[in-house]
Amino acid sequence: MNEISKSFKFDFNHPVDQLWSIVADTPRWGEASGFPRYQSTEQLQTDGTIKVFGEVTIAGMNLSWEEPPANWIEGLWFEQLRLFNNGPFDSMATRAELVDKCPQSSLSIEISFVPRNLLGYFLARRLIAAFRGKVQQLLDIADQLIKAEQPDLFETDFQLSPSAKERVKKVKQAIDQTEYGHGLTDKLLEYITGKQEVDLWTMRPLALAHRWQVEPRFAIELFLQSVREGLLESRWDVLCPRCRVSKAKTDNIGELPGKVHCHACNIDFEANFARNVELSFSPSPSVRAVEYGYYCRSGPGFTPHIKGQCTLDPGESRALPARLSPGEYRIRTLEAGDELIFTHDANLLPEINLLQGQLKLGGNSPDGEILLHNNSPVQRTIVIEDRSWLSEVLTAERVTTMQAFRDLFSDQVLRPGDEITIRNISFVFTDLVDSTKLFADIGDAAAYQLVREHYAILGEVVRKHDGTIVKTRGDGIHAAFLTPDAALLASIEMQQAIRQFRNASRSDPISIRIGINSGSSISVNLNDRLDYYGKTVNFAARLESQGRAGDISMSRQFVEDPAVAEILRDYNLHEHEAVFKGSIEPVAVYQIAP
């Protein structure tokens, strides 16, 4: 039968960015409209492309379809297509174009159906007739919420059951009584009950820290404590390095698979603590059961970090209107293949060429456009991806170096014999100077109490700077930090805190010396806990012995870190050489006495 189509135009009294966040967010729109979730599968084709299929049952009728990749440029336009295998339609397509009329904007939408039979013909006309009213209603609600400074259009009012309310009340009290609640429990509960299921499938504490305008550590600790108390559940997701979709899940870090396959990208990859192993969260089913499925898989709302996506036939070139914010972007194909990274500085966008599976940047595209060329012999979909979203991913590398994780998830350890490489981590070793003399001077009981108090001081500083105490050793600690600057700032504060403790509370001589080093390491299971092994950690321990009371001793590699160098500008940095056990050549040691 012939295609039935209709175009509509809408005016919106707010900027185009806000309009885009509404009309392009098809997953949340689908859930808010009461559409059923559907299941999705992927099939690799002989030419390397991926076909995505959807399936759902509506009113007892099973529908299945192919869902080709959607095309879009953020803030400007998008188009989607479904090719049905059965049911009343052969196909359904939508195309939307947005126009910036600063400070207002406008939207043009074309919706079309190809009916398979008379039922499809009448159903298409009915759906098209209702479509305009639904879009206008959505925009009117959005207009009211924006005016009321309540921009979350797709919030829901989920009602807890009486038993869940009682459970949540007890859980909230338990969390608030710990040091990890930070007064944020109410905000978390509002999020769990006020957001759609789409928002709750994968909850990211770093994203909520930004939303709540609080320190990232506060949100992470809140989430970890909430898992402990039964408000949330946690899981380890292994993300595909290309499409960034979770391809393996496990509850315990010791059960992470060594190798993972992504059917969509047709690649095998390994779990990497720093790059693609994420600790994510969802509500406990005892509080709010969340059902998983898709409302719209192919649209821009499902992958908001993808700013542009376009399918090109062999030999096809397209000049697309485009605008990208300054920042770092990754260009890749939706299919397995090459990728490259470029930095956009708000000037002209580069020309993108695909030739024999290789992506290359050409000259500048015309102002306000981006030129895409597919010079390969097969159809390919080019993807432009904003890399800043990675900052919201709570990696295994980051969370396992936090004290709250050690305190609350001590059962999360690697399998015996497993090793995980950590690409960059900083280690701090401390030692209580002249502790033997201290015990002799003031007695075992008093000295032991002093040692415990000094451990508490150091532990508080370590946690404040997002570090973790790996273990205590002798009269000192072995701590780990994700970044070198955090390790240095914590070490400086440790020295200052111990000095204040000594001066304010007693005349007993107590002081520490510290050694710091950074680099790669191996995470292992040692005595049923996460520990670290390798040259980096060994050298940090040796550096500690080089200092005197009040000193911080550092390696050359550590002090050459740009963030560390900036901090050290405020201190007198001294350098000397030392020969360490097991080495012949002298090694540079750098020291400050803050």
Model-derived features with residue positions:
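A conserved amphipathic terminal alpha-helix motif
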Residues: 1, 112-157
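Hydrophobic ligand-binding cavity/cleft-lining segments
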Residues: 1-46
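Hydrophobic-ligand binding "helix-grip"
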Residues: 31, 57-106, 112-114
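Cys/His-rich short segments
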Residues: 227-295
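Regulatory cytosolic signal-relay segments
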Residues: 371-423
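Catalytic NTP-binding/metal-coordinating core of nucleotidyl cyclase/transferase enzymes
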Residues: 412, 416-490
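Catalytic core of nucleotidyl cyclases, primarily class III adenylyl/guanylyl cyclases
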Residues: 429-430, 461-489, 493, 500-536
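Cytosolic regulatory/linker segments at or just downstream of nucleotide-handling modules
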Residues: 549-594
